[in-house]
Structures are given as structure tokens and as C-alpha cells.
Amino acid sequence: HIEGDYLHHILHKITEGWRGQMDFYCTVYGGGIHLIDLMRWLMSEEIKEVTSMGTSIPVKNSNYKWMDTITSLLKWEKGATGKTTTCLAPVRNKFHSLNIYGTKKTFINDRPSGKLFNTAGDNVSHIKVKDPYPGMAKGDMLPDFINSIRKKNKPDVNEIDIFRVMTVCFGIWEATKKKK
């Protein structure tokens, strides 16, 4: 089982900024896509099924007419399950949660450090993972992308991966609208 959540208090960006002025804006397309992409990459397989629901409680008295929070359950082609939440309203620090629950090890992305569990039980201990979070600046991957356009090189993330993660996000939005 794997979980990835995009948690970022940016209500002002969707109620007062350009996102809220668009004919349509989906929080999964703008935020959650990053965790969905990461989970696909870590699992090395495709998501074959989604079910989703969302809420608009924090934005109900604003001009923003779309859901600010969407939670989805995912099923991978080999049977693994997952969960992703995109929430643009939590009162907390920005965080990209990633939890991987395995039968041999479990990884929990946390602050101030991640946790790696090698054993289970009541008196379980964990190894602190002290790698920097987020580990790179926001624009660090742009040079490769720009180079791939200018020099017609193959980018680190190709169009097939982009379209596959977008297909999952479209499926999440459709499931949310249909309440399935």
C-alpha cells in the first residue's frame, strides 16, 4: 500500500489568484499530480482503477466554484492499493506526504526526518532518514526540460509518462464528479 498527499494551505491562490479566475481548475491537476507521478514511478506499474470524492467546504463562500480537497483510492495493475489526497486548505506547513507500507519495510515521510521501519510490533523502533526535504529547489529540473526542447534530447520525463499520469488525474476528476 502506498499513500501520497499534497497538503498546502493556498486558499488565497484559488480564491483570489489566477487559478480561481479560470473557467476550470482542478486541485489534482495543479498539486496532486506530483505525488501521483511519484507513486507511479516508485511502484513501476500503472494505476488501473480510481475512486474519488471531494469537498468545497472552505471555499463555499468564495467565487471559486471547484473542490479544494479531493481524496482518491487507487488500484495498481498488480493489485496493490494506494491513496492520495490533494488539500489546498489545511492549516499546517506545506507538505508532500509519502508513506509506503510493505511487508518487509515501511517508509514514512515525516518532519523533521523520515522514518524507515524494519520490524513490526508494539516496541518497534525506526531508522531516521535525514535526507533533506524537499531535497531540491522548485526549478531544479527545468534545465533538463529546456535542454530537451532546444537540443531535441530525450527528457528525463517523457511524453508517455506525462500522458499516463494525466490520464490518472482525469480519471480522478471524472470519478469525483460522478461520486464514484
Go through the PLM ranges and name each one.
Residues 1-64, 72, 179:
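Predominantly a Rossmann-like dinucleotide-binding segment in NAD(P)-dependent oxidoreductases
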Residues 31-34, 137, 160, 164:
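A generic structural signal for residues located within well-ordered alpha-helices
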Residues 35-36, 138-143, 169:
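A general structural signal for well-ordered alpha-helical segments in protein cores
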Residues 36, 66-70, 159, 166-169:
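Conserved glycosyltransferase catalytic-site signature
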Residues 42-46, 103-107, 169-176:
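Phosphate/oxyanion-binding loops and surfaces in catalytic or ligand/nucleic-acid-binding neighborhoods
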Residues 46-47, 51, 80, 153-154:
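Secondary-structure boundary/capping signal
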Residues 60-67, 76-141, 158:
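NAD(P)-dinucleotide binding in Rossmann-like oxidoreductases
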Residues 77, 144-180:
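C-terminal helix-rich "cap/oligomerization" subdomain common to oxidoreductases
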